[in-house]
Amino acid sequence: MGTVTTSDGTNIFYKDWGPRDGLPVVFHHGWPLSADDWDNQMLFFLSHGYRVIAHDRRGHGRSDQPSTGHDMDTYAADVAALTEALDLRGAVHIGHSTGGGEVARYVARAEPGRVAKAVLVSAVPPVMVKSDTNPDGLPLEVFDEFRAALAANRAQFYIDVPSGPFYGFNREGATVSQGLIDHWWLQGMMGAANAHYECIAAFSETDFTDDLKRIDVPVLVAHGTDDQVVPYADAAPKSAELLANATLKSYEGLPHGMLSTHPEVLNPDLLAFVKS
């Protein structure tokens, strides 16, 4: 564990486990979580001999809580600072949800040789919010409701999200894990309310179309068809179509947080893609 200081003085917390000569796999978490959300996958890849790295986005987890920089350009710049500090080359970057947007923006701008492959898991690209150019997106009012709920009672909102749509625990017959709900809440409450509030616009309104078009490394696009947070039809197949070298993997009936609810399904596919 350590920190890297960005150009604006923000300290970014990160974990760095495994052999320094191992192939680096970098994990990017979703909103409003932390690097801890990838614990299962980090241990899995560590057991296969990889070097595994994950950071807490600014304003999230154990990183600093600055008043500025809660946008995709800055998130990507923070990742660049981390990869440069650790001198990561030929890395695989895996992003979930908001972290998938961060991966898209970073990889599209990365120095040659820094990135070998990327994975977008239940990721927000190409763009979430509805507009004239994205008529199938979610109405802005959905994200206004997110902001209102966060501002009114963040602690309760951070119980409601994982108890319901995030993990699909609101579906009939779902096996509810109180541990996952509590873990989600704890990660969320570690971060800064202002950062989480502003990040809602970052993950919902940022258009990653041009980023996806610029990426030329192989990309696995993995998404559950019962994603109630980032609807499958307006995300994964559209991203795969924009990417030059994409593999689309659909998971029938799996939720947004499938990396935690179904790691035994997702992890082997991630490993196979990294090794391919």
Curated annotation (Swiss-Prot):
Residues 24-254 form the AB hydrolase-1 domain. The active site is at S97, D227, H256. Keywords: Chloride, Oxidoreductase, Peroxidase. SUPFAM superfamilies: alpha/beta-Hydrolases (SSF53474). GO terms for molecular function: chloride peroxidase activity. It comes from the Bacteria. Its EC number is 1.11.1.-. InterPro entries: AB_hydrolase (IPR050471), AB_hydrolase_1 (IPR000073), AB_hydrolase_fold (IPR029058), Epox_hydrolase-like (IPR000639). Homodimer. PANTHER family: HYDROLASE, ALPHA/BETA FOLD FAMILY PROTEIN, NON-HEME CHLOROPEROXIDASE. Belongs to the AB hydrolase superfamily. Bacterial non-heme haloperoxidase / perhydrolase family. This is Non-heme chloroperoxidase. It comes from Streptomyces lividans.
